Amino acid sequence: AFSENGQKWGSPVYNWSRMEEDGFAWWQARMLEHAKLFDVIRLDHFAAIVKYYVVPNKAEDGRSGKWSRGPGKKLTDAIEKVIGDTHIIVEDIAGKSPIPGVKKLMARTGWPGIKILMFAFGDDTANEHLPHNYTDCNLVVYAGTHDNETIVGYFRDKTDYELAYLLSLIHISEPTR
Protein backbone atom coordinates (compact mmCIF):
# COMPACT_ATOMS: atom_id res chain seq x y z
CA ALA A 1 0.00 0.00 0.00
CA PHE A 2 2.85 2.41 0.75
CA SER A 3 5.51 2.90 -1.94
CA GLU A 4 8.42 5.25 -2.68
CA ASN A 5 7.19 5.33 -6.29
CA GLY A 6 3.79 6.64 -5.28
CA GLN A 7 0.58 4.83 -6.05
CA LYS A 8 -0.95 4.31 -9.46
CA TRP A 9 -4.34 2.70 -9.06
CA GLY A 10 -5.53 3.03 -12.64
CA SER A 11 -8.89 4.37 -11.48
CA PRO A 12 -10.73 7.07 -13.41
CA VAL A 13 -10.84 10.51 -11.81
CA TYR A 14 -14.20 12.08 -10.99
CA ASN A 15 -15.27 14.91 -13.29
CA TRP A 16 -16.04 17.22 -10.38
CA SER A 17 -17.16 20.17 -12.51
CA ARG A 18 -19.73 17.98 -14.26
CA MET A 19 -20.91 16.51 -10.96
CA GLU A 20 -21.30 20.00 -9.52
CA GLU A 21 -23.59 20.97 -12.43
CA ASP A 22 -26.31 18.64 -11.14
CA GLY A 23 -25.67 19.35 -7.46
CA PHE A 24 -23.64 16.17 -6.98
CA ALA A 25 -26.76 14.05 -7.62
CA TRP A 26 -24.74 10.84 -8.07
CA TRP A 27 -23.08 11.35 -4.68
CA GLN A 28 -26.39 12.21 -3.05
CA ALA A 29 -28.04 9.08 -4.44
CA ARG A 30 -25.13 6.91 -3.33
CA MET A 31 -25.03 8.40 0.18
CA LEU A 32 -28.81 8.17 0.51
CA GLU A 33 -28.67 4.44 -0.28
CA HIS A 34 -25.86 3.97 2.24
CA ALA A 35 -27.84 5.93 4.83
CA LYS A 36 -30.72 3.46 4.40
CA LEU A 37 -28.37 0.57 5.18
CA PHE A 38 -25.96 1.94 7.78
CA ASP A 39 -26.01 4.11 10.90
CA VAL A 40 -22.45 5.27 10.22
CA ILE A 41 -20.67 5.80 6.89
CA ARG A 42 -16.89 6.13 6.59
CA LEU A 43 -15.60 8.27 3.73
CA ASP A 44 -12.23 6.85 2.74
CA HIS A 45 -9.60 9.21 1.28
CA PHE A 46 -11.49 12.26 2.56
CA ALA A 47 -8.51 14.52 1.83
CA ALA A 48 -9.24 14.05 -1.88
CA ILE A 49 -12.43 16.06 -1.44
CA VAL A 50 -10.10 19.00 -0.76
CA LYS A 51 -7.14 18.13 -3.00
CA TYR A 52 -6.26 14.99 -4.94
CA TYR A 53 -3.37 13.65 -6.98
CA VAL A 54 -3.94 12.76 -10.63
CA VAL A 55 -1.55 10.32 -12.29
CA PRO A 56 -1.55 10.22 -16.11
CA ASN A 57 -2.87 6.94 -17.47
CA LYS A 58 0.34 6.23 -19.40
CA ALA A 59 2.65 6.95 -16.45
CA GLU A 60 4.75 4.03 -15.22
CA ASP A 61 4.17 4.84 -11.56
CA GLY A 62 2.68 7.46 -9.26
CA ARG A 63 5.59 9.91 -9.25
CA SER A 64 4.56 11.90 -12.35
CA GLY A 65 1.15 13.14 -11.26
CA LYS A 66 -0.15 16.58 -10.39
CA TRP A 67 -2.34 17.98 -7.64
CA SER A 68 -5.89 19.10 -8.44
CA ARG A 69 -8.46 20.89 -6.33
CA GLY A 70 -11.44 18.86 -5.09
CA PRO A 71 -15.03 20.06 -4.63
CA GLY A 72 -14.64 20.68 -0.88
CA LYS A 73 -17.56 22.16 1.02
CA LYS A 74 -19.86 22.06 -2.01
CA LEU A 75 -19.77 18.26 -1.92
CA THR A 76 -20.03 17.92 1.86
CA ASP A 77 -23.03 20.28 1.86
CA ALA A 78 -24.71 18.16 -0.84
CA ILE A 79 -24.09 15.00 1.20
CA GLU A 80 -25.45 16.55 4.39
CA LYS A 81 -28.71 17.41 2.62
CA VAL A 82 -29.58 13.74 2.14
CA ILE A 83 -28.07 11.66 4.96
CA GLY A 84 -30.51 12.54 7.71
CA ASP A 85 -29.36 11.18 11.09
CA THR A 86 -26.66 8.98 9.58
CA HIS A 87 -23.23 9.74 11.00
CA ILE A 88 -20.16 10.30 8.84
CA ILE A 89 -16.60 9.35 9.81
CA VAL A 90 -13.79 10.56 7.58
CA GLU A 91 -10.52 8.81 6.92
CA ASP A 92 -8.18 11.75 7.30
CA ILE A 93 -4.82 10.02 7.66
CA ALA A 94 -2.33 12.46 6.19
CA GLY A 95 0.98 10.72 6.64
CA LYS A 96 3.99 13.00 6.46
CA SER A 97 2.34 15.61 4.23
CA PRO A 98 -1.02 16.84 5.56
CA ILE A 99 -3.19 18.48 2.91
CA PRO A 100 -4.07 22.06 3.86
CA GLY A 101 -7.80 22.57 4.27
CA VAL A 102 -8.74 19.04 5.35
CA LYS A 103 -8.97 19.83 9.09
CA LYS A 104 -10.85 23.05 8.30
CA LEU A 105 -13.44 21.16 6.23
CA MET A 106 -13.77 18.56 8.99
CA ALA A 107 -14.38 21.35 11.52
CA ARG A 108 -17.07 22.85 9.26
CA THR A 109 -18.90 19.54 8.92
CA GLY A 110 -18.28 18.29 12.46
CA TRP A 111 -17.38 14.92 10.97
CA PRO A 112 -14.85 13.04 13.10
CA GLY A 113 -11.55 11.78 11.77
CA ILE A 114 -9.67 8.64 12.69
CA LYS A 115 -6.53 7.56 14.51
CA ILE A 116 -4.73 4.27 13.87
CA LEU A 117 -3.16 2.49 16.85
CA MET A 118 -0.69 0.59 14.66
CA PHE A 119 0.75 3.94 13.59
CA ALA A 120 1.15 5.04 17.21
CA PHE A 121 3.85 2.84 18.57
CA GLY A 122 7.49 3.67 18.04
CA ASP A 123 10.07 6.09 19.34
CA ASP A 124 8.15 9.32 18.72
CA THR A 125 6.41 10.27 21.97
CA ALA A 126 4.64 13.13 20.15
CA ASN A 127 3.02 10.77 17.61
CA GLU A 128 -0.54 11.99 16.97
CA HIS A 129 -1.85 8.41 17.00
CA LEU A 130 -0.72 7.74 20.59
CA PRO A 131 -3.83 7.83 22.78
CA HIS A 132 -2.35 10.30 25.28
CA ASN A 133 -1.70 12.76 22.41
CA TYR A 134 -5.29 12.98 21.20
CA THR A 135 -6.22 16.66 21.22
CA ASP A 136 -9.81 16.17 20.10
CA CYS A 137 -12.46 13.78 21.34
CA ASN A 138 -14.35 13.96 18.02
CA LEU A 139 -12.53 10.98 16.52
CA VAL A 140 -12.72 7.24 16.02
CA VAL A 141 -9.80 4.97 16.88
CA TYR A 142 -9.07 1.88 14.80
CA ALA A 143 -6.45 -0.77 15.46
CA GLY A 144 -5.58 -0.59 11.75
CA THR A 145 -7.10 -0.28 8.30
CA HIS A 146 -7.12 -2.30 5.10
CA ASP A 147 -3.66 -0.83 4.44
CA ASN A 148 -2.17 -2.41 7.57
CA GLU A 149 -1.17 -5.88 8.64
CA THR A 150 -3.87 -7.69 10.65
CA ILE A 151 -3.89 -6.94 14.37
CA VAL A 152 -3.07 -10.59 15.09
CA GLY A 153 -0.02 -10.46 12.83
CA TYR A 154 1.01 -7.10 14.23
CA PHE A 155 1.03 -8.32 17.84
CA ARG A 156 2.51 -11.70 16.94
CA ASP A 157 5.63 -9.97 15.60
CA LYS A 158 6.26 -8.01 18.82
CA THR A 159 8.68 -9.05 21.55
CA ASP A 160 7.25 -9.56 25.03
CA TYR A 161 8.76 -6.21 26.04
CA GLU A 162 7.23 -4.38 23.05
CA LEU A 163 3.88 -6.04 23.63
CA ALA A 164 3.83 -5.08 27.32
CA TYR A 165 4.74 -1.49 26.40
CA LEU A 166 2.06 -1.25 23.71
CA LEU A 167 -0.62 -2.67 25.96
CA SER A 168 0.36 -0.34 28.82
CA LEU A 169 -0.30 2.63 26.53
CA ILE A 170 -3.88 1.48 26.04
CA HIS A 171 -4.25 0.48 29.71
CA ILE A 172 -4.21 -3.29 29.31
CA SER A 173 -1.86 -4.91 31.80
CA GLU A 174 -1.85 -8.63 31.01
CA PRO A 175 -0.65 -9.62 27.55
CA THR A 176 -1.89 -12.97 26.33
CA ARG A 177 -0.53 -14.81 23.33
Labelled PLM ranges:
Residues 45, 146, 171:
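Histidine-centered active-site/metal-ligand motif
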